Amino acid sequence: MSDDERVTKPFKFVTGVDARFPNVNQTKHCWQNYVDYHKCILAKGEDFAPCRQFWLAYRSLCPSGWYQRWDEQREAGNFPVKLE
């Protein structure tokens, strides 16, 4: 097969193993990555590349309804974690 015939597929992110979350239920893992992402961008800025790892992780682990609700809570000022 030549390089011209090769078809590439889009990259699908899969979260790796995190020793802090050894169980099958990944709810806490989802939550922690969401919080870590927002703490990271507040501390380092949106353009800081390592923050993207947290973004990819929470987007792959969390149902979209969860992080949309958390975004609404952050905007309303009643998010349960202090991110600063």
From Swiss-Prot:
Pathway where it operates: Energy metabolism; oxidative phosphorylation
Database matches in Pfam families: COX6B
Motif (Cx10C motif): 51-62
Localization per Swiss-Prot or TrEMBL: Mitochondrion inner membrane
GO terms, biological process: oxidative phosphorylation; proton transmembrane transport
Membrane topology category: Peripheral membrane protein
Every CHCH domain range: 27-70
UniProt KW Membrane keyword: yes
Cysteine disulfide links: 30-62, 40-51
Superkingdom of the organism of origin: Eukaryota
Keywords of this entry: Disulfide bond, Membrane, Mitochondrion, Mitochondrion inner membrane
Gene Ontology CC annotation, any one: respiratory chain complex IV
Entries under InterPro entries matching the protein: COX6B-like, CX6/COA6-like_sf, Cyt_c_oxidase_su6B
Motif range (Cx9C motif): 30-40
Domain notes: The Cx9C/Cx10C motifs are involved in the recognition by the mitochondrial MIA40-ERV1 disulfide relay system and the subsequent transfer of disulfide bonds by dithiol/disulfide exchange reactions to the newly imported protein.
Family listed: Belongs to the cytochrome c oxidase subunit 6B family.
Self-association state and partner proteins as the record states: Component of the cytochrome c oxidase (complex IV, CIV), a multisubunit enzyme composed of 11 subunits. The complex is composed of a catalytic core of 3 subunits Cox1, Cox2 and Cox3, encoded in the mitochondrial DNA, and 8 supernumerary subunits Cox4, Cox5a/Cox5, Cox6, Cox7, Cox8, Cox7a/Cox9, Cox6b/Cox12 and Cox6a/Cox13, which are encoded in the nuclear genome.
Function field: Component of the cytochrome c oxidase, the last enzyme in the mitochondrial electron transport chain which drives oxidative phosphorylation. The respiratory chain contains 3 multisubunit complexes succinate dehydrogenase (complex II, CII), ubiquinol-cytochrome c oxidoreductase (cytochrome b-c1 complex, complex III, CIII) and cytochrome c oxidase (complex IV, CIV), that cooperate to transfer electrons derived from NADH and succinate to molecular oxygen, creating an electrochemical gradient over the inner membrane that drives transmembrane transport and the ATP synthase.
Annotated protein name in UniProt: Cytochrome c oxidase subunit 12, mitochondrial
UniProt organism field: Neurospora crassa (strain ATCC 24698 / 74-OR23-1A / CBS 708.71 / DSM 1257 / FGSC 987)
Organism lineage string: Eukaryota, Fungi, Dikarya, Ascomycota, Pezizomycotina
